[in-house]
Every structure is written in C-alpha cells, then in structure tokens.
Amino acid sequence: MRGSYRMMDWEKTRVINMVARALQYLEKYEIDDINFTHEDVNPYNLKEGLEALGYEWSDSEDNRYDFWWYFTKENEYTVCVFFDAQTFELNMSLCIHEDEEI
C-alpha cells in the first residue's frame, strides 16, 4: 500500500535531523532548492519529517510531478516538496504559497 511504511525510531530521528538541517541551509544561504537522492529519503519520510517539525501538509493541484506538497507552519516559510517518480527527483524549497501575501 502506498505510503504505509513506518520509519523506525532511529530512521525517523535521522530524517528529522536531515530535514531540519536542509531547512536551515535553505534559509541561511538563500539557495533555491535542495535535491535529495532516494538513498537519503523518500517522499513519505520527508513528509513525516516535516510534520514532526510542526509543519502542516497540504496537497497541490499541480500535475507536473507525482507529488507536489506544501507544508506550512505559523511564522515560518512555506516549504514546497515535489517528487518525480520517473527521475526519482525529490526536491525541497522554501516558497510562497499562492494563498500567502508577499
């Protein structure tokens, strides 16, 4: 079943730490995005890591990718995650959601 895999505690800690470092890196160095390899993390683990950091998930209607998710947290950047199953490209960026004011 899609997305039913549950991470072990050590794996969840690794993913949460990796996601937290990636978010800090995106903000500190003002880079556009970070690409993850499928050896690093899969889309569901990345989603779980962001949720563990207090971000709320919402889906996008953008059909260019297999997954295009938004994660929001009060007083924080919106985080966009997209995954292309053809290329295994998993990308995370800080973005402005269409509902947010610039």
Where are these regions (language model features)?
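Acidic, low-complexity, intrinsically disordered interaction modules
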Residues: 29-102
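N-terminal trafficking/processing presequences and adjacent post-cleavage segments
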Residues: 1-43
